[in-house]
Amino acid sequence: MRASQWFLVTQKETPNDAEIASHQLMLRSGMIRKLGSGLYTWMPLGLRVLRKVENIVREEMNKTHAMELLMPSVQPAELWQETGRWETFGGQLLTMKDSNQREYCFGPTHEEVITDIMRNELQSYKQLPVNFYQIQTKFRDEIRPRFGVMRAREFIMKDAYSFHLSLESLQETYKDMYQAYCRIFDRMGLKYRAVEADTGAIGGSASHEFQVLAESGEDLIFYSDASDYAANIEQATSLKPPKANQSCNETITLVDTPNKKTIDEVASFLGIASNQTIKTLIVKGKEHPMVALVLRGDDELNEVKATKHPLVHSPLSFIDEELILKTLKTPLGSIGPVKLNIPVIVDHQALAMPSFVCGANQADKHFINAAWERDAKYDDAYDLRNVKEGDPSPDGRGTLHCCRGIEVGHVFQLGDKYAKAMNASVINEQGQLQTMIMGCYGLGITRVVAAAIEQHHDEHGIIWPQALAPFQVNIIPLNGARSHAVKEQAESLYQQLKSHGIDVLLDDRNERAGVLFADNDLIGIPHRLVVSERNLEQGCIEYKSRTSSETQLINLDKVVNFIIELINK
């Protein structure tokens, strides 16, 4: 491609509304342009990158024998009403009516559509397992779209769906897709982790997220330094501590804590550390009006874990202070598990404390030297907390460390959630109708582009991994308009590299060298070749890698092979 014939529009200034590096650089390099809130046009430069992502994904999906199809973006409401998600999906579901007042949504995902297709197309166990995928535009009506295409309302996604009769078959396909995702991100040159994850609104029995590691990532990931264990903050757990094996010899004592309502205030007043206290949170129960969740004072409640407890109402709902005072006759800051007449669920870390400070269920009063069993009873012990850096890994191997990531892929073992709701069944080997079970495998195509930039950039611009770069090589002829030798050599190099299947940009614009070099760094082309009269006099071409500040001179007759070897490494 010749830059003079290409729509190459870059910006020096960073847009004011661009918060993170990928958003800033995608706008400055001319990859995207904003149309509206959370809506972006992919310009020619950005589309080249997007297509490279799609091609890698498509190649690896095809290797798993998944079959590509394309489903409608607009979906009838009846399908979503069958599964109950029309009511439960929430405000992110963009709904509409046609001229006949029939209701539809613009699909944020396609579980209902694919299940509807397969319940009509599949009749026998002999047709299973099957796996279908598409690369399709989705829409989620984000309340606050931000970070450019990282959290846009309209986005492109690869979603795949597999159908099975046995859990063993599902697990086999799940493993194949998991490995395909690893190959995809390896080929893209991205540093990532596959982590255990909560199934969330999609549902299912097991899932893994694929997280591209980046300091700007919104997700917290915990991983062991001595094993393969890794999970996101919602799912991560630590080695369960033993229950307190020593009894408290001190007598439980009631003390005044005037106007001390928070853990920090109580701990400071009593001259103790916050990890010597416990806190009691009151939430709505599934069968009881109120349930108490008890954690060590320095721990944070993991709301996803708490919601999974059978006694806790979903979604998690905290009881307001006025109702607590009316029902329990105790202000919120003084509640504790001693003689508390509602179900009590205690976190394992809190249960491991031989004694603790807790609210006394009287205003401005706390107990010191309280102990489990002797003074405080509980209904269940459960993992309720967010893990912390330095916690022991749950597999007993190593300690947990924390990093940030950007979720770019998510795979699920759905089970029969959708198939059962939509009566998707086939005749099994015994001649009986059996409900199918499903797998679901999502990968954010547009998000991968932004995540790659978050991981690969510097103060000058993007540093594309070779597999994703819009162009692999940039040839810059200096003063090519005035020097026939420079122009001729640049053209010769351009044609030779193209003949070897290399994506080449010939930047033949009539601009100053500084502008051409700055644009190359901003766009992030991995390999730069500069053709100048001075270098030609020495029989050389100047080479510079985007990852290095150093330049080197390469003999003219060796340049093509030099580039080919670099690209094929």
From Swiss-Prot:
Catalytic activity: tRNA(Pro) + L-proline + ATP = L-prolyl-tRNA(Pro) + AMP + diphosphate
Gene3D superfamilies associated with the record: Anticodon-binding domain, Bira Bifunctional Protein, Domain 2, YbaK/aminoacyl-tRNA synthetase-associated domain
Gene Ontology process terms (BP): prolyl-tRNA aminoacylation
Gene Ontology molecular function, alphabetical: aminoacyl-tRNA deacylase activity; ATP binding; proline-tRNA ligase activity
Enzyme type, top EC level: ligase
EC number: 6.1.1.15
Protein name, entry field: Proline--tRNA ligase
Family: Belongs to the class-II aminoacyl-tRNA synthetase family. ProS type 1 subfamily.
Function comment: Catalyzes the attachment of proline to tRNA(Pro) in a two-step reaction: proline is first activated by ATP to form Pro-AMP and then transferred to the acceptor end of tRNA(Pro). As ProRS can inadvertently accommodate and process non-cognate amino acids such as alanine and cysteine, to avoid such errors it has two additional distinct editing activities against alanine. One activity is designated as 'pretransfer' editing and involves the tRNA(Pro)-independent hydrolysis of activated Ala-AMP.
CDD domains according to UniProt: ProRS-INS, ProRS_anticodon_short, ProRS_core_prok
Annotated gene: proS
